[in-house]
Structures are given as structure tokens and as C-alpha cells.
Amino acid sequence: MVPKNTSGSTQTGKNSINNTFGTFGHPLLTLITVISIRWNMGNKFCRYCESILMPNQKRCGACGKIVEDTGNIFSRFERKETVPEQEIAIVENKDAPYMPYKPRELQMDIIMDIKKALDGGRHIVIESGTGTGKTIVSLAGGLEHAKQHGKKVVYLTRTISQSDQVMKELKAISKIKPISGITVTGRNKSCPLFKGEDIDVPPNVLSLMCEERKGRSQRGSSGGCRYFDRTRVVLDNIASFSKENFPTSEELDKYCEGLGACPYEAKKLLMKEFDVVTAPYIHILSEDIRSNFIANLGGEETPLLLIIDEAHNIVDAAREQESFRITMRMIDTAVDECSTMSAQWVGEGIKAEDVIKNIRSTIKGIATEKIGLGKTEYRLPQDAVESPLITKFGFQKKDLEHITDAIINLGERRMDSLLEKGDNSVSELYELGIALKNWMVSDDGRYVKALKLSDEGEYLSAACIDPSDIVTFMRSLKGAVHMSGTLQPLDQYHKIMGLPRDTIARTYPSPFPKENRAVIYVNDVTTRYDEMNRDPSMVTRIEKKIAKLCWNADKNTLVFFPSYKMMKNMRPFLERDIDKPLYWEESGHQKKTMRALDEFRKGKSGVFFSVMGGSIAEGIDFPGDELCFAIIVGIPFPPPSLEQKAMSEMFDMRYGEGLGWKYTSETPAIRKIRQAIGRLIRNETDRGMAVILDSRASKYQRQLEAGLSQDPVADAVMFFEKDSNR
């Protein structure tokens, strides 16, 4: 077991500071001299791009970023007076009439930039640091423009908790201006018949089941929906409750259910009456859902102002939305379902069961031939699944669409018969039919079609690498707000989203004291694949560093790994050598993970092990002492895959040789690290430190605002001693 007071762990003198902050490529004396020269010149250089600045220039003309004082790098561990909590405005702000608070530093700049861009019909892409109040400034700037131009604001969020924050800010705005807002969620989150059930049903399948039940209610047939019947009766009550209380999504759902009404149906009917509608990404990313969503908002004649929260997630979300797979479980259960049906003809003399079995045989054959020892994927040539069907049953390629339509119709009839019996079960035949149709019409230029192998067996994968539909939609908008705390490089986001050339890009730093956060990295370990293979001791050295850091920082600590696999492999050593309360993010077990997280947050010196890019790293706030220390293991470059290779090649062709890897691997990895570091500081008084255990961080020290440390344990002890001496 690692001893709690490791030799050298309490070194807090001159050598420790020199090691941490004096190794940026120059001897320490030279570094001080350079800083002194700059300081005496009035700090006339941009800290980001090194461009010369004019006197009193607030924004760098070269890179567009707000200029900050370089300051004294040795003062970063010192505690200074913190920014006071944001105050409610006493009188209306004439320059920002929808801003309910006394503005913090930079907030008026952001609001003015948003309004100016929107008034000019332009998109604005913003990276805004923690504490700038992304939600309130985007609403304040967006609402002023929307009200003047008769637009409805659609605020897109990745999580329900983010939509709840929008409602909280709208409630504050309502105290100074008449405003209304409502949160919309998907059927699977709001439908009383399916809410809380552990089902993985595609939205289009759930929509069909819902429409069928509503149709039965309207016809007075059995198998209808009692919640739908009640909704219109109490709709005025729901509207009044929403406009008076600005409820969260959960609060509104409970209110509707208390009246015996369907929350989903009520929101759908009411949203056209509200100024602001918050919704998950899928309401815009899915073409089918978007069409219905816009119709419910008032139709094409209702102009929209889109505000995208956590915009760095939108591109991946768009790809995931358009991607799909066909698993052996889907195929096997569809075959079983066919055996219960007396009539299953999908063509002249052709049964659905025979078609599906042929597809299963094709998948098995390709897997046997192409996926050997150590391989888990094989990129399929064009028509690899379709050709055996054509050969077997003797029809033309154009007939395949009729075959899949017939399978879908069989599934619909199957669900009708189940509903007659009061059974909510999904037809596997219908679900498979939809997936097969999508497979056969998906463009090979936009999708990577592959056969893959997992622990559960073989499956067909259609991974979207070019979500052109959302790009087309974004370009059709006359202005939108794209915001995130980790969106750089902004020009890359601009290109991938296909935004107009006149799009405005802005970066705003956090107003919180820089001294409250420290980021350091080490240069003697790495999780780079070839180096870990070449040096068998690398894993052990990383494990020991994690253990020593956890031992010597008597604070709540989050350890972020680049993958679940690495976390699993290191777990036995860490459980043996860290004598503290330990908690783990469990892949595929969300409830278990959340219970562990609740216990971790209640303590003061526990260690929670997680994965970068997961829900803990991006979706959870840890105010105060809930989190003080982050250990980041490695650089989370995505693992090699057919999709990564295809996307990289696509971006190389579009934007220039070498940019493909940067866009698909480097930027997402750095963004994940920045998101993980961002968990540390969530308000003015938070203090936190992050240690990156990977020498490759030296390449990204400017983006990560990190300094090299020769003794991270000593530097962590020194940083947290400032807290104990307060």
C-alpha cells in the first residue's frame, strides 16, 4: 500500500515551484525577464496568438479573443477576493431589457454581440467560460431580437437538467418583462404509458404506437389512451400552470399526470402559445421529428431563433441520430415473431421469414470469411447484403423497397393485434423492417456500412459520417446562437456545420479568479498505445502516480480515464492501494453509477473513477467541496475505427491534408479534457486542481492552460494548503 506521507510529498519550497512553472522551454530567469519586458511595455501582446496590441485594445484583431493581462504566473496559487454572486437588477437595463441581473464582467459584451449578429441576420459562434452565464446572456440577447422581429425562440439542450436551467432564468426574466416558456421532451420521457420503462424503441416506432392508440380513442375503439382523452379537457389548466410557474420538465409532467392528462400531448398542443420552447437536440436533428415540431410551433410561417446549448456536442449528436445498426437479436426475434403469424407474404411466393433468414445467413457467412482472429469489423462493399437476396429470390434491386415495405406492414398489423389485447409490446418485425429500409436507401457516400463483432454477436452498422441534413437546415436559418464552454477551434465548428461565411466568432474568458484553478501535467508517463506496449512498466507507473496523488490530496477527487477498458484493467491495483472510499462509473448501469455518485458527493475525501466524454465528465456539476481535485489519465484520442478513418479522409479532401486527423481525433480529445477540467470550477468561490498524466499534454499546454510539473504530489499539497490556511 502507498504510504500516506510519501517521501517528498510535502516539499513546498522553491524547487517545487520552479519545477512546476519554470519549464516552458526557457530557464526560469529568462522566463521572468521575458515577462518583465512585456509587463513594462504595458502588456501589448495577445496571450493567445502573440500578436501586438494597440493601446487600450480590448479584443485582439488577429484572433478575435478578448485580451487579458498576462499577470504574474507565480500568483496562480494565491487566493484572492472572489467575485460576488450575481445580483438581481433593481432597475431595467435599457441596453439589455431582458437581463434580470446586474451584469457581471463581459456579460453586456456578449449580449450586445449576440443581438448585433442576429439583427444582421448572421449566426454567432461563441465559446464562453464558466461564470459568464451562457444561459442568461443568450436568452437576454436572443429575446430582445426575437421580440422585435416576431420570432419564437427554440433553445436546444443536450440534457433535461440544462432545460431546467432555461426555465429558471425565464422565471427571473418574467419579473421584469412579460415572457413565457415551456420544456418539451420526447415521448419516451413524457408518455405516461412508456415513461420509466426500460425499452429501447426508435422514435418512429413509438410514434406509430402512440398514433394508433390515439386513433382508437378518437374512434371510441378498445385499446385507446385514457390520458389522450383527458388532455384537451384540462389543457387550459396546464397552460395557466406553465405560464405562472415556469415548471421544470419533471414538475410539468407530474402536474399533467395528476390531472390524468398526457404531458407529451399537452406540450405538443401548447407550445405555439409560448415565447420560448426548450427541447432536446433530436427535435431538430431528426428530419421527421423536426417537421412535426415546426408544425406544432406554428408552421413554416413562424420564424425561429435557434439557440444551441453545449454546441460542441451537436455534430456528434447529428451523426449518432442518423446512424443505426441491425443486430442478430433483432433478426432472431423477428424470425420468432414470423412463426406466430399465419400469413407473412412479402412478395409472390416469398415469406418474410425466408427473407430475414437469408439476411442472417449472409451476415454469418461474411463474419466467418472476413472477421478473423483479433478483428472486430469489416467494411462491406456496396450491396453486400442486397445481392444475396436478389440472387436467392430472383427479383430486381428496385423490388427490395417493396419487400421492406411489406415487412413493415406485417409489423404494423402485428402491433394492431397486440393493442387489441391491451399489449404495449413493440413488433420486432416492424422495427427490423424500418432498419432494413434505412439500410437500403442510405447513401454509401455519407455512411460507412460495416459488419462488426461485439460480445453479443455480429451486427450490421451504418455509421453516418456526414450529417448533411442538419447542415442544410442550419444554413436555411437567418441567424442562430451556437454556444459552449469548450467550442474552440471556432473556425473548425464553423466549417463542419456548414455555417455561412459571414458567421461571427467570439471567445470570452471566465470571470472567476484564475488563482482558484491550477492545471499541471507530467512528462514521464503516457497512455500512448505503442509506448505502453514497448514499456511494460508504464501501466504500473501510471497506477502508482494515481494512488500517490489520491493519498496526498485529502479532497474529493475525480479520476478520468480515456476508456472503460483502461479503467477496468487498472481497477484491481487501485482498489488494493488506495485506502479511501472508492466509487466507480459503471458502463451500462446508470442507476448504479448515480447511487455511487450521490455517496461520493456527500463525502469529503472520496475518489470517483470515471471516463472522459461520459455523463460524469460533461453533464454533472460539483459545487464547493463536492469536487476539488481531478486526475486525468492520458489523452482520450478516439480508438481507430472504420468510421474514424473515413471521416478523416473526408475532411482531408474538403479542408486540406492533415486536417482530417485534427478534426476527428485531436480536437475532440482536447475538448474532452477541457470538459473534465471544467468540473472543478462552477462558481466564484470554488477552488480546484487538475493533473494530466501524459507527456503529450505538452503539445496542448496553451489550449489546456497547463504547466509542467516535476513533482505533482508536492504541487498538489502546496495548492490545497492554501485552503487549510484560509
Ranges and model annotations:
Residues 138, 161-164, 168, 257-402, ...:
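Signature of the SF2 helicase/ATPase Hel1-core->accessory helical subdomain module
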Residues 562-586:
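Conserved helicase motor "Helicase C" RecA-like lobe of SF1/SF2 P-loop NTPases
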